[in-house]
Amino acid sequence: MFKIIACINKRGVIGNHGKLLYSIKNDMKNFKSMTIGNVVIMGRYTFESLPKKKPLKDRINIIITKDNEYNVEASDNVFIVHSISEAVELTTTMFSDKEWFVIGGSTIYRQFLDEGLVDEMRLTYVDDDAEGNVKFPMFNTDSWYTYYESLTQTESYFPFTFRVLKKK
């Protein structure tokens, strides 16, 4: 099954105009430690929001796009697919020995949740109410339980917690 990683605030906002809403060092460190050596799955816009539009180093990068002409610089750790089902087939056949992380954006999160493909969400909750134009999709909280929650930390003026939610 797939795991979601996201950083969201009290309003459910995850981004604004192609950029992450928060740059929290501990969140980035946590993200890196979980995903290194594993598979990250993202939509094209999330990929294009990465620094220099380059794949994440030391990870298998799977980019989902509807654009059949979409291409990126040749790399042995980047795969372009055109649907959730193609991403699922690729990960389950070629990368069954790795963990699979869905890293955004909102539409990709929604599709994986709607298909029932996610069994764990690793969320950084920021105690802030900033607005943005990209939100984490609504999900049925009754179907999930909190497996882990960190103590509240503060960095860059924002209190935050790490939570791991697992599917009931």
What are these regions (language model features)?
Residues M1-K168:
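Enzymes that bind and transform nitrogen-containing heteroaromatic metabolites
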